[in-house]
């Protein structure tokens, strides 16, 4: 029998997932510049009361062409560690801050119009793990429960998706939850230092402030939920939005420390910095120094 293998989802353009999402062709992206410094996950906001739920989901895809049934826990955990390295960092961060972390595992080649399509939830408990199988119908019910009701895609539509499942759910009233791009952790202690959001600058010229898009209403809920997550983790840490170019000829990376949230009704940029690419490359130490100057 083939070995059970997992892989990280790859962001792709649009609901059809026709091409990989663009990043800067030579410099890469903040995910690469901060590799090993952050944790990321999907999270829920109950919009009936504006509260971040304790449930965190980390999605991983079962590689097609291999055994699709999860093995015994030791082998399953080994498969996750081969993909994620220090899986315990995610568990440790979540449990230390009152969250309930899980890994959601699924074969993304399934027919997502079939309510009986199978997914697996690996619950990471303080002293062990528990694996639960769920149908697509049950996952949709869970999404609605944790979101405080039905939840649909906004007016901008789905521009980037990390799986065929997310694309399928974007056409329903059980939208897959959004993610935290990165929780920056202090080396050695895993103390949270900031909540990070990554924005792509797709046009020519200098990047535009996130405030412009928030005030237009198009991205309001996205930044409100990020600030709600920050408040849930620690009101003392900042939210930093990092806007980076994807055009080869552009080099300006914009950092903005923001405040937003449903109770504030507006987004405020408290401080900002710029960091430039050099010859199409990012000096990672300079990037980190610029980020740290906002913390």
Describe every region a protein language model picked out.
Residues 88-117, 224-260:
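Nucleic-acid nuclease catalytic cores
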Residues 73-90, 214-225, 280, 284-287:
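Well-ordered, non-membrane alpha-helical segments in soluble/globular domains
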Residues 106-107, 178, 185, 198, ...:
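Short His-Asn-centered micro-motif
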Residues 19-24, 200-203, 262:
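Charged, low-complexity, helix-prone segments enriched in Lys/Glu/Asp/Gln
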Residues 82-85, 153-167, 172-175, 205-247:
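Acidic, metal/cofactor-coordinating or nucleic-acid-engaging core segments within structured domains
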Residues 113-137, 253-295:
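Active-site or metal-binding loop neighborhoods of secreted/extracellular toxin and effector enzymes
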